[in-house]
């Protein structure tokens, strides 16, 4: 999806922490099956929430420093950031309805 920004250890601060909008970060890796199943869900959500929530993906294998800094221990993990702080965390694969509920209840 064009609505998703791929963030790295280097760009995380700029793209996520300093974002004026809430940011949903999806931590994933190539070998993670549940991450692949949920990817289309995140793409749809990123499009539907465009302008309200910024969607970002961080590959935890390529960017090992960022997830532990915010308490992510496993993948898939979704984190909603607001004003540079973690507002909410969801661990494990989620369905579209679960992700929508997660965003709406924290938004």
Curated annotation (Swiss-Prot):
This is Thioredoxin. It comes from the Bacteria. The keyword Metal-binding does not apply. Keywords: Disulfide bond, Electron transport, Redox-active center, Transport. InterPro entries: Thioredoxin, Thioredoxin-like_sf, Thioredoxin_domain. One of its GO terms (cellular component) is cytosol. One of its GO terms (molecular function) is protein-disulfide reductase activity. Participates in various redox reactions through the reversible oxidation of its active center dithiol to a disulfide and catalyzes dithiol-disulfide exchange reactions. The keyword 4Fe-4S does not apply. GO terms for biological process: cell redox homeostasis.
């Amino acid at each position: 999806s064009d609505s998703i920004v791929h963030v790295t250890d280097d760009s995380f601060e700029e793209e996520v922490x300093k974002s004026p909008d809430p940011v949903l970060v999806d931590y994933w890796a190539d070998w993670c099956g549940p991450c692949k199943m949920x990817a289309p869900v995140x793409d749809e959500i990123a499009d539907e929430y465009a302008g309200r929530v910024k969607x970002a993906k961080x590959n935890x294998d390529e960017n090992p420093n960022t997830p532990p800094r915010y308490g992510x221990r496993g993948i898939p993990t979704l984190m909603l950031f607001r004003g540079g702080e973690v507002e909410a965390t969801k661990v494990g694969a989620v369905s579209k309805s679960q992700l929508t509920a997660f965003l709406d209840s924290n938004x």
